[in-house]
Amino acid sequence: MQQAKAVARTVRIAPRKARLVMDLIRGKQVGEAVSILNHTPKAASPIIEKVLKSAIANAEHNYEMDANNLVVTQAYVNEGPTLKRFRPRAMGRASQINKRTSHITIVVSEKKEG
């Protein structure tokens, strides 16, 4: 069974927030997944939709798969490098602010007949 993959690395969204959206599309057909992402009011939705469309395009172009038969087989978010920033606080102190990034991976494959 052939698989097509798309990865977006070091995306400026917290992995915890991106996983909430990713859980909605895992195991779904790609058409259904795209419509779910269009109707999900989260900041991660357009980013994940772009990665999903890239995976679909990779499947069509590189492996000659039919887009109508594609299913999201794997969808996961890993933690990327953290950008560390500092916020000034009272009495000359400073608090560290972690700007988290994500590595978003989506794998699609053709669903089995039957």
UniProtKB/Swiss-Prot annotation:
UniProt cross-references to Pfam families, sorted A to Z: Ribosomal_L22
UniProt GO molecular function: rRNA binding; structural constituent of ribosome
PROSITE patterns: RIBOSOMAL_L22
Assigned GO CC terms: cytosolic large ribosomal subunit
Protein keywords: Ribonucleoprotein, Ribosomal protein, RNA-binding, rRNA-binding
InterPro entries: Ribosomal_uL22, Ribosomal_uL22_bac/chlpt-type, Ribosomal_uL22_bac/org-type, Ribosomal_uL22_CS, Ribosomal_uL22_sf
An annotated GO BP: translation
Cysteine disulfide partners in this protein: none
Quaternary structure note: Part of the 50S ribosomal subunit.
Family to which the UniProt record says this protein belongs: Belongs to the universal ribosomal protein uL22 family.
Reported function: This protein binds specifically to 23S rRNA; its binding is stimulated by other ribosomal proteins, e.g. L4, L17, and L20. It is important during the early stages of 50S assembly. It makes multiple contacts with different domains of the 23S rRNA in the assembled 50S subunit and ribosome.
Name of the protein: Large ribosomal subunit protein uL22
Organism: Bacillus licheniformis (strain ATCC 14580 / DSM 13 / JCM 2505 / CCUG 7422 / NBRC 12200 / NCIMB 9375 / NCTC 10341 / NRRL NRS-1264 / Gibson 46)
Gene, per the UniProt record: rplV
